[in-house]
Amino acid sequence: MVTRRALHFVFKVGNRFQTVHFFRDVLGMQVLRHEEFEEGCKAACNGPYDGKWSKTMVGFGPEDDHFVAELTYNYGIGDYKLGNDFMGLTLASSQAVSNARRLEWPLSKVAEGVFETEAPGGYKFYLQDRSPSQSDPVLKVTLAVSDLQKSLNYWSNLLGMKIYEQDEEKKWALLGYADDQCKLELQGIQGAVDHSAAFGRIAFSCPQKELPDLEDLMKRESQSILTPLVSLDTPGKATVQVVILADPDGHEICFVGDEAFRELSKMDPKGSKLLDDAMAADKSDEWFATRNKPKASG
């Protein structure tokens, strides 16, 4: 029985309005929940920032059985410098391709039936012009690695992912926890992986009782633990336990206790309105404009 699930990828966003337009109107995702926070997260969910921030979960369906995007917005930060760490998110949706064309969102054809586009901030998305063969159109997240064998040892032997496909020559591998889940694609690159300021985080869930064992395993293997096991509170919602790890290239990985996360991640029918209200109330762009100052870079 599969006990681990691929949950979401965290994107830091500088322009919340444009980003929401991309995910909602171009990709066709829906707002699943929206949360506002007055101070930084204990597990650095919003990055190394300690001010006011928001989290918006968007996806093609409920978080219980869809891989979704977490859009993290730090008030006062206008952009984040991109590294070479995140290489793209691939989804199968003819609707997204047709939405992009209708809205004149830039698309470039990279293969037969596959189009590359960019979310605000420069994050790459690959849209396959076809209907998804599974219930979730999100197929894979691609991350850059500097040493494929070292990465495979980490993700497969330590984190227990199945290797679905690999090509030594092309320095490429596809991994996952289950056939019907979003996959992780590792792509070897020349040189070091640069996370810069825009670096994201990939999240998985496991039974809560496995979290201390996972942390102990990483200690024994002398692997990086960015945030030891900690409880995270969300106002008015379930408290979850998480441990934050980093792979050999420094990609951040969150493991969260599944039972509490299923409670926390329940779809909020008011999510879209909460987001729209927050965007309408966000005067940070105007505040900086009237003072002739640019927003800070991440």
UniProtKB/Swiss-Prot annotation:
Keywords: Mitochondrion, Phosphoprotein, Repeat. The modification Phosphoserine is found at residue 131. It holds the Pfam family GLOD4_N. SUPFAM superfamilies: Glyoxalase/Bleomycin resistance protein/Dihydroxybiphenyl dioxygenase (SSF54593). The modification N6-succinyllysine is found at residues 109, 273. One of its GO terms (cellular component) is mitochondrion. It is found in: Mitochondrion. The keyword Nuclease does not apply. Residues 5-130, 137-258 form the VOC domain. CDD domains: GLOD4_C, GLOD4_N. It comes from the Eukaryota. PROSITE patterns: VOC (PS51819). Belongs to the glyoxalase I family. Interacts with NUDT9. This is Glyoxalase domain-containing protein 4. It comes from Rattus norvegicus. The gene is Glod4.
